[in-house]
Design a protein with these regions (language model features):
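N-terminal Rossmann NAD(P)H-binding glycine-rich loop of SDR-like oxidoreductase domains
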Residues: 2-32
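Substrate-positioning beta->alpha
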Residues: 176-197, 203
């Protein structure tokens, strides 16, 4: 269907170009020859220069700064979202409303397609603050009338640094028996699939890295990266539940949002279709040196 519509001459707007994933997507789109318009809060934070790359400053939380930003654009890609709430902004302010601002502007300018980066299993995790905003945005995008693709990645390699931080001390702590599995993905591999989504007709894509690993196996990789003896401490789940109750009761959503997400996904299988060729073991070894 899309072969006759999409080409490297298409104009792509990327929102969130200076984030971890956004940098890899920018590089991939430029490499593929697309005419790329990268939207950033601060131009100084993006170093890539290319003839087919234009850098624009805008505040996606302020719709007045987005006026005409989608003019002559064919596809919008948004990685906009926050892990930790800051600047007084909530998940609803950023993950939801900022992307609504982009969708509305894109629709007004006749953009053909909107690609949104969400999170794996977000549909099952709507009760979590982070996922509530992302899923509400997904619902809004689906009802917008625009062609769309929602990409749901597993955790990034960079999210696995908690394992490394523990391994550096000589012990890794896990909730439960450590047998639950996940396949985190490198930003470079995910960027490749995001670029592919421009030209296919998939509406939703679940995606993870090439290696499906148990939490025990990830802990072992982290300990080996630091050449430490394998020492994994398995904590009973009541400790996790108590900690989760405590942060929800005694801290603000600003503080507990990322903690409740981490603690909830730690007791879930987070398995996604395998993609890419970057290995978590290599990432850990590089980080540990």
């Amino acid at each position: 269907m899309y072969g006759s519509i999409w080409s490297s001459k298409n104009k792509i707007l990327l929102a969130g170009a200076t984030g971890y994933l956004g940098r890899f997507i920018t590089e991939k789109l430029v490499e593929k020859g697309y005419d790329v318009r990268a939207v950033v809060r601060n131009k100084d934070k993006i170093n890539l220069k290319a003839q087919n790359l234009t850098i624009l400053e805008a505040q996606v939380t302020q719709p007045e700064t987005l006026k005409n930003i989608c003019e002559n654009i064919d596809v919008v890609i948004s990685t906009i979202g926050i892990t930790r709430q800051k600047d007084g902004l909530t998940y609803m302010d950023v993950d939801f409303q900022s992307n609504v601002n982009l969708i509305d502007e894109a629709k007004k300018e006749g953009v053909k397609k909107f690609i949104y980066i969400s999170v794996l299993n977000g549909e099952k995790l709507r009760h979590l603050k982070i996922c509530e905003a992302k899923e509400k945005l997904g619902d809004y995008l689906k009802s917008s009338g625009m062609d769309y693709c929602i990409i749901r990645p597993n955790g990034f390699f960079s999210d696995m640094k908690d394992f490394l931080n523990m391994a550096k001390t000589g012990k890794v702590y896990l909730f439960g028996d450590g047998k639950l599995k996940l396949n985190p993905i490198h930003g470079k591999d995910l960027a490749k699939e995001v670029a592919n989504a421009i030209r296919n007709d998939k509406k939703e894509i679940n995606i993870g890295g090439p290696d499906l690993l148990s939490q025990n196996e990830i802990a072992e990789l982290a300990l080996r990266a630091y050449k430490k003896p394998i020492k994994i401490i398995h904590l009973p789940d009541w400790i996790r539940k108590l900690a989760l109750w405590s942060v929800r009761t005694f801290t603000s959503a600003k503080t507990y949002g990322p903690i409740e997400f981490f603690m909830t996904t730690m007791v879930m299988d987070m398995e996604a279709p395998q993609f890419g060729n970057h290995k978590l073991e290599d990432f850990f070894n590089d980080e540990a040196t």
